[in-house]
Regions:
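Membrane-proximal, proline-rich intrinsically disordered regions
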Residues: 21-73, 314, 405, 458-476
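Conserved, well-structured interaction surfaces
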Residues: 86-163, 185-193, 209-210, 372-379, ...
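Hydrophobic-face positions in mid-chain alpha helices that act as interaction patches
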Residues: 221-236, 242-252, 264-267, 271-384, ...
Length: 476
């Protein structure tokens, strides 16, 4: 993974030139620095990499939007092992008015909109720059442009999921701004429907832009050995490290998978199905690009790198996670394995290689890999199982419960469950089974809470609040 670390080390170049107090201001310290930064192709590469670093900050996917705060809201962890004065204990009770909880919520907003400002800055620069600046000419320019558009869409989508109601309870009000210009003169707030259309537009354009690299010229880079580890056949490896590790980047299929997630949120179930199916069936040289590791091999690949479509990198992940599973810590992220995995002896996700034990309860081993181990820094954002769940829901909403069950069982079988197939008799029955499967499959990945919210299902906890108030200091 040392080649990827070289990429990550270069990310600080952008951040050092883009520090600012305002969440919509990315002006560098002086114009000379900006002019110098974007005079060469490396400046654009560093700027893009800086956006990924922003995405992986602890205030976003590095912790709070993956295995931390958002998992607490989804009640994945037992509050019995949380100090009563801790931010997480208060968050589990939906005490959004608490100062500590407010700070985390404010961090979501400021991190996202600062990242969005960086996206807009890069999009503005790259769209007007001569192709001669880029080593790989049009392919590289379009790839950078497309990834920046996709990241802008992702930041906005997550802020909408946090600070606006789901489409199940949408009231037509305007909750967040969609900022897509540089420099910013003023901001305009939009309805959920308007925001989703803007997200869709950005993602469709982004996918078209990255297609030349990922689909037309280098489809082999989408295979797991290249996508996650950059160690395929030496003759086909990217000469430049910048083009490696496409699984940590907004590649063509990551954008397609994100579109599937967005369409599902929008209740456009057929569009969501089509995008999810495109990912599930994606091939190169007659081989599926995405799959599941064998259930017997899962213990040696606890994150299932074969099924990862998009991840972020946090090189301090193991150290960040360790205090929350240490036996003498005052706040620990522990769960009841017997409850989540329903006592299954077949489900390898509940095996000792996947979960550790403390005081008769469990913790996830996803983020306990030693530094330097393959994938130790990976935090999954989108994985293959979610695509199967999206396809299953489409079938269920069309009363095709047999096919819906087959989609759920495709993931269950991959995890070792072969003796108990899903027998679905109604949409409500399907939703209940779906939520159970998501809880098992995506522990520590921050998706369960959003599924509850999307479905307006508040049965999992008392006093659930699905919409954050906009931070007081961020009023426009």
């Amino acid at each position: 993974m040392s080649r990827k670390r070289n990429i990550v080390c270069s990310l600080f170049v952008m951040l050092l030139t883009m520090s600012s107090c305002s969440w919509l201001d990315v002006s560098p310290s002086n114009e000379v620095n900006e002019e110098d930064m974007f005079s060469k192709g490396d400046g654009y590469r560093n700027a893009l990499n800086g956006l990924y670093l922003k995405l992986s900050e602890s205030s976003f996917y590095g912790r709070n939007l993956s295995w931390g705060f958002i998992e607490v809201l989804g009640q994945q962890y037992l509050t019995d092992f949380m100090e009563r004065t801790s931010t997480y204990y208060k968050a589990a009770g939906y005490k959004y008015d608490d100062a500590d909880v407010k700070s985390v919520i404010s961090g979501f907003w400021s991190t996202a909109y600062n990242g969005i400002a960086g996206c807009n800055h890069l999009i503005f620069k790259v769209s007007e720059t001569d192709l001669s600046v880029f080593q790989e000419r049009e392919m590289e320019r379009n790839m950078i442009w497309g990834e920046a558009l996709a990241l802008r869409a992702l930041f906005h989508f997550d802020i909408m999921r946090l600070f606006a109601p789901s489409m199940e309870t949408d009231d037509g009000k305007k909750y967040i701004p969609y900022v897509d210009s540089y420099p910013v003169i003023s901001t305009t707030y939009y309805t959920n429907t308007e925001i989703l259309k803007k997200i869709e537009s950005d993602l469709l354009q982004a996918r078209d832009l990255v297609a030349k690299c990922d689909i037309e010229e280098h489809p082999e880079w989408m295979e797991t050995s290249y996508r996650m580890f950059a160690r395929g056949m030496s003759s086909e490896l990217p000469e430049e490290v910048f083009f490696a590790y496409r699984g940590y980047r907004m590649n063509y299929y990551a954008i397609t998978a994100l579109l599937a997630r967005v369409y599902l949120w929008e209740k456009e179930y057929k569009k969501a199905f089509d995008c999810a199916e495109a990912v599930v069936k994606a091939t190169h040289n007659d081989r599926l690009l995405f799959g599941f590791v064998g259930s017997s091999e899962l213990g040696g690949d606890v994150k299932d790198s074969e099924s990862l479509i998009f991840t972020v990198s946090n090189e301090t992940l193991t150290d960040d996670f360790k205090p929350f599973i240490t036996s003498d810590s005052k706040t620990r992220f522990l769960f009841s394995g017997s409850s989540i995995f329903e006592g299954s002896q077949e489900d390898q996700r509940g095996s000792s290689s996947m979960v550790g034990n403390q005081e008769s309860v469990q913790y996830s081993k996803k983020y306990t890999l030693a530094e330097g181990t393959d994938g130790y820094d990976m935090i999954p954002v989108i994985r293959l199982s979610e695509m199967y769940y999206i396809m299953a829901e489409y079938y269920a909403r069309n009363a095709n419960f047999i096919e819906a069950g087959k989609m759920l069982d495709a993931v269950r079988s991959a995890r070792g469950i072969i003796s108990n197939t899903s027998n679905i008799i109604s949409l409500d029955d399907f939703i209940g089974k779906l939520l159970k499967e998501i809880r098992k499959e995506l522990i520590g990945e921050g998706q369960l809470y959003f599924q509850y919210k999307r479905l307006n299902n508040n049965s999992f906890a008392d006093g659930v609040k699905f919409v954050f108030d906009r931070p007081e200091n961020e009023e426009i």
